[in-house]
Every structure is written in structure tokens, then in C-alpha cells.
Amino acid sequence: MAVYTDVSDGALRAFLSLYDIGDLTAYRGIAEGVENSNFVLRTTGGDFILTLYERRVDPADLPWFLGLMGCLSDHGLSCPRPVVARDGQALRTLAGRPAAITTFLPGVWPREVRVAHCAPVGAALAALHMAGQGFGAERANALGPDAWPGLVAACRADGDSVQPGLMAELDAALAEILPAWPARDDLPRGQIHADLFPDNVFFLDGAVSGIIDFYFACTDLLAYDIAICLNAWCFDADGTFDAARGRALIAGYESVRPLTDAERRALPVLAAGAATRFLLTRLYDWVNTPAGAMVTRKDPLDYLKRLRFHRAARNMASYGL
């Protein structure tokens, strides 16, 4: 979360007058994050989050995202629930940006991931997948395997400036991963979060109190979401895989939804693909973002060691799972 678009007090109060959420008593911008402008609203009716969607979010996707969040909330998942105005609409315009209000979730995200976080995260991810069965509309994964060759091409001219030989290593990785990628109907599919990093999961008293930031969510292989979490939650800062965290994550997930044998066999290639996806999008931002642009760059090399680990893995035993 972050603030890129300022909102005047008068414009905000006029906007809130369309809702039945009480009178505004205070508001503040949220500094964290990289994609949208976010504000905490305090009203006489409670606390809420106001999001203004910036240019990196396709407005055409917003009804799907908001619909998914509403469905997941209806099915008991602790996630932001879109608040509708008196006219029944959740999506409006404020300060020239698409905007929506959602419910406020208590808790804080873990700055240092421990084994104790991983089982609750796995269980919450499985609960998300189960709840998502109630949402029939599909959204293609715009950053799935079909997008990776184009990202490589867009980074080719400058990618080796980040690390010599990086582009050749990415070429070799794609040559392994893409032919081995499971077909659409090979594994269970459904609605996935696709970005469940620690800063998108809130904890309170040791339990998951909320999952946020659904703006990369899409319809894809459920096990790919697990693979993303293995990358995001189960590696040390130096890129070393922590098998204890991995075991906890998988055990937590399977306490809600057991994996199929085919999903288990596919996890190494899915994890390699997930590492490739985040390496490539970080690399693209690193080499293509001009100074002063509205993007916070993250080091792509954080994912290179992860990718190398996954490429060397042959089965779940390679992960100590």
C-alpha cells in the first residue's frame, strides 16, 4: 500500500457522503506498498480502507477483483470486503482514479518470518482456494508462463548489467520450465491469490487475521499458489531454503485441502516457475523504470538463488518434504 494520488478533504467528504458508513472523524495515508494509493478512514461507523487504483491496475479488472473479495468474505475468509454505496455500487471515481472502500482488517504482517507463521499461512491459503470455488468468473493469469518469454525479451538489452550471464541463465531456465509446465487440466484449478507474500498476510495473537491485496489474483493452478508461497515464506534472507518452514506450510495447507499426487510431483517445476515470474517482473522494473517513476524497485537477484535451488530439485524429497 502507498499514496501516489492526493485527495482533498472536501473531495473525500463528498465521496463518503454517498455511503452509509458514518461521519468521517480522521484519515491518513498508508506509506507501505507499491501499487495503489491507500488511506485508513476512521468514521463514526468504524474503520475502513480507501483505495485509489493507480495506472498499473487495469480498470477493466476491478469488478472481478472486488467480486472475488466479496465472495471470499461471504464464504468466511478474513479478507477486505468491498463496501457498497447507497446506489449498490462498490466501484466509483475519486480524484480522477477508480476508487473503492473496503473493510478494515486488524493485525500486522510479520517482518521476520518464522516456522510458526507458515502452518497458519498454508491453512489460510487452502481456505482461500476452497472459498474461491464459489466464484465462477475467471480471470487469466496475465503474469503466467505465457508472459515470461516476452518479459525476457523486454529485459534482454540491459539484463546482464544486473548480473553478467543473467539472461543466458533465464533462457536456460525457460527452456526447462515451459515444456514441463502442467497443462490447464492436469491439476486442480481455481481462484488463486498469486501474490501471498508476508506483507499481504496479517497476524493477530499468532493466528492469521486477514489476507489483503488481491490485485494479482487470477484463475490458475492451485498448486502454483502454493509454489509462490514456498518462495515467499520458506527461504532465508541469503536465499537458503528452510525445510522446516516448507513442511509447516504444506502441512497447514493439507490440514484443509490435501494435495493430489500429481500436484506433489509438479511442485518443483511450479516453484521454479514462480521464482522465474518474480525474478522477471523485478528485473523488468529494475531495467525499465526511469528515475522518479511511481514504482518501488525490488532486487531481482533475491530470486535467482531460489530459481537455482528449484532447478536442482527433482522431487519433494529435495525440499525435505
UniProtKB/Swiss-Prot annotation:
Pfam assignment, any one: APH
Alphabetical keyword list: Amino-acid biosynthesis, ATP-binding, Kinase, Nucleotide-binding, Threonine biosynthesis, Transferase
Regions that span the bilayer: none
Keyword ATP-binding in record: yes
Pathway where this protein functions: Amino-acid biosynthesis; L-threonine biosynthesis; L-threonine from L-aspartate: step 4/5
GO molecular function: ATP binding; homoserine kinase activity
Catalytic activity from the UniProt record: L-homoserine + ATP = O-phospho-L-homoserine + ADP + H(+)
GO biological process: threonine biosynthetic process
EC number: 2.7.1.39
Family, similarity comment: Belongs to the pseudomonas-type ThrB family.
Protein name: Homoserine kinase
Provenance organism: Gluconacetobacter diazotrophicus (strain ATCC 49037 / DSM 5601 / CCUG 37298 / CIP 103539 / LMG 7603 / PAl5)
Name of the encoding gene: thrB
